[in-house]
Regions:
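Catalytic domains of carbohydrate-active enzymes, especially glycoside hydrolases
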Residues: 96-108
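Active-site mouth loops of central-metabolism enzymes
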Residues: 42, 74-89, 109-110, 138-142
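Flexible, glycine/charged-enriched surface loops at secondary-structure junctions
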Residues: 25-27, 64-67, 159-163
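Metal- or metallocofactor-binding catalytic centers and their adjacent structured scaffolds
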Residues: 1-59
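N-terminal small/glycine-rich loop or linker at the start of catalytic domains
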Residues: 59-85, 119, 128
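Short, acidic/polar
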Residues: 85-97, 144-148
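Catalytic core of soluble alpha/beta enzymes
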Residues: 107-171
Length: 171
C-alpha cells in the first residue's frame, strides 16, 4: 500500500471487515487485531485509533487529553519549517519567522551532505537563546552521510530528525 491518501483508503477497506462488531473502547485488543490483519502501515491504523480515543472520550464525557493523563499546559509551541534553499537564504528566513512568533525552527536537509552541513551551521548561527533548531533529513542520508553530518555539526545545538531510511541505520 502506498503511504498516501489512496493507500489509507485501501488499508481501511482491508481492515474494515476485521473491525466490524469490535468494541472501540477496548483499544489494546483492537490494535492487536489491526496489527494481525494488516502488518505495518501505521498511517492506516492511526486514524482508526484516534477515532476510538474520541469515542472513549465521548462515552466518558471527558476530553481525550484527560484520558491520556491530563493537560500538559494551556498551549504548545509550534515550529516553522524552513524549506531547502541556499544556506544563506535559509539563515535569512529565521528572522522573518521569528517576527511571526516562531521560536522552533525545522530546517529541511537531506540532500548533499556538504550543503546540509552549511545549512545547519548558517541557520544555527541565527538561533537565539531559548530557541530550538531541528534538522530534518526526511530519511535522505545514507548511514555514512548521516554520521559525517553529525560529526561536522557536533558543536551545534541541533536535533537531527529522520536522518536515514530505517531505524537500524539510525543507531
Amino acid at each position: 500500500l502506498p503511504a498516501y491518501a489512496d493507500g489509507v483508503r485501501s488499508g481501511i477497506r482491508e481492515l474494515g471487515p476485521h473491525l466490524i462488531g469490535q468494541d472501540p473502547l477496548l483499544l489494546g485488543p483492537l490494535n492487536r487485531l489491526m496489527d494481525k490483519a494488516l502488518r505495518g502501515h501505521p498511517y492506516v491504523k492511526s486514524p482508526i485509533d484516534i477515532a476510538c480515543w474520541d469515542i472513549k472520550g465521548k462515552v466518558a464525557k471527558l476530553p481525550v487529553c484527560e484520558l491520556l493523563g491530563g493537560r500538559y499546559g494551556d498551549d504548545f509551541v509550534l515550529y516553522r519549517a524552513i524549506s531547502q534553499q541556499d544556506p544563506a537564504e535559509m539563515a535569512t528566513n529565521v528572522q522573518s519567522y521569528r517576527d511571526q512568533g516562531y521560536r522552533r525552527f525545522q530546517l529541511k536537509v537531506g540532500g548533499d551532505p556538504n550543503v546540509d552541513i552549511e545549512r545547519i551551521k548558517q541557520v544555527a548561527a541565527q538561533i537565539q537563546p531559548g530557541e530550538k533548531l531541528i534538522a530534518d533529513a526526511n530519511t535522505g542520508w545514507l548511514m555514512h552521510e548521516a554520521a559525517r553530518v553529525c560529526r561536522a555539526v557536533a558543536d551545534v545545538d541541533v536535533y537531527i530528525e529522520q536522518p536515514c531510511l530505517t531505524y537500524e541505520e539510525c543507531l
